[in-house]
Amino acid sequence: MKRIILSLVAVTLIGLNLNAQNMNKKALVVYFSVTGNTATVANNLADAIGADIFEIEPMQLYTSDDLDWTDENSRSSIEMKDSKARPEMNNNLDDAKEYDLIYLGFPIWWYTAPKIVNTFLEKTDMAGKTIVLFATSGGSGMENTVESLKPSAPKATFKRGKVLSKDASQEELKEFAKTALK
């Protein structure tokens, strides 16, 4: 009986230690936003967890015509059909070395992340990082996100995360940040 109790105590302490290690990691919230919904969530998440923040800025801003998914000739439709499309960024994250944990947010386009997110991952050394994905969406899920992003940062560990509402409370965002690491 003593062994069982000691084993349970040891397992509990190990679990608490792992959780404390995750909470002590330096976090960065990175996001791409066109309409402002993902920016709202990203800024609120960074505030809720005390993380730094970085916005992925496209070299050429997207217009409402660019985002018309019903038009097969719109910019976003063309980019999303081309697996090699990598829209240029207007900025770069100079150094990600100080961060262990990256919360990466974006709007869902065609059940996955916009191609500029791949551009960011390929331009930034993500080796050894844990990347927790989050998204905003008008109704689509995140079904293909890890699969489409992993090749752009093969030495990172991806966590699927979830779709978040721009109206998510600080408590909801803290809970998301905590449970996403499990």
Model-derived features: positions:
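N-terminal beta1-alpha1-beta2 submodule of the flavodoxin-like/Rossmannoid cofactor-binding fold
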Residues: 20-100, 111-113, 118, 122, ...
